[in-house]
């Protein structure tokens, strides 16, 4: 991937428009988690430290285009950002009619981009209106990179200079390192409730990795493909043949899809359900598999410790219930102890990493849910493609 980076730009005396992802959750009318705001601080501070004025734009919630309601207002986000920066961050509601006059060191925020008509349809005129505000456009919203919208793609095409922010560049560099030029052996963990939601990821990674670990309902479907009885466990019988093809593809290249030989089962999916460890051959008809067993976890942990690159998407058990968390904990700790370059993404994965206290030991934690998954699938991310295109158009590569 070839794109300009904010940290390569001379922004002194310029106005920089940063598309951030500050779509934070609220509880009781207050921001309950400011992780996404903090994630883009590096880009904002780079601009301020180098003599620029900054305009931040973000989406918040899912408003109806052309309509404004109090819950759509980014004012609380602007106030929180201002608190972190030690500055007053004003919200601009009429920025199309009144272009802001800014001085170096100023920071302002546009009103919620998703109330603008044409935002979701990637309207070029709206993109031009955004671009007219700035000398340099910065996309720092990896979480929305898989969407072609006016504030991510059209603006990049219209801006004098379009580049990746510190967060965006970090995401793309880490993903590129993990998937484009991985240290071997490369191991991927893909887990979740359904093969159908991650089939394209499994197929794409099967071409790249040396070992493909599956977990959750996905593993159950693969166990069915191996002819194993899984009781009343969650599985997709109609995708057994697809699972067989993926296992055959891995075997043909000398790799494998290592499936559990022992599992943790229960008769009900509940926080107080009794957990029983069994060999896979002993799973009864009235039992469901809710985690991998200790022998399987130990074997997979050895694979991870010996890996050169690890890509992790999804917990291998119902880790929210402590009695079914052992497998995911063992793998998390193995990744933390491994010398491999590791990258992890997806909401449940991040929750597991936090629960087991290994955040600092993971090489890179992706902030993008859908964008992370689509990158794993090998899909083009529209917002990233726009940055690459503008670099080519400007004759820079």
UniProtKB/Swiss-Prot annotation:
GO biological process, one term: glycolytic process
GO molecular function: ADP binding; ATP binding; phosphoglycerate kinase activity
Assigned GO CC terms: cytosol
Catalytic activity as recorded in UniProt: (2R)-3-phosphoglycerate + ATP = (2R)-3-phospho-glyceroyl phosphate + ADP
Localization of this protein: Cytoplasm
Alphabetical keyword list: ATP-binding, Cytoplasm, Glycolysis, Kinase, Nucleotide-binding, Transferase
Any single Pfam family the record assigns to this protein: PGK
PANTHER family hit by this protein: PHOSPHOGLYCERATE KINASE, PHOSPHOGLYCERATE KINASE 1, CHLOROPLASTIC-RELATED
Summary of subunit composition and partner proteins: Monomer.
The family this protein is said to belong to: Belongs to the phosphoglycerate kinase family.
This protein's name: Phosphoglycerate kinase
GN (gene name): pgk
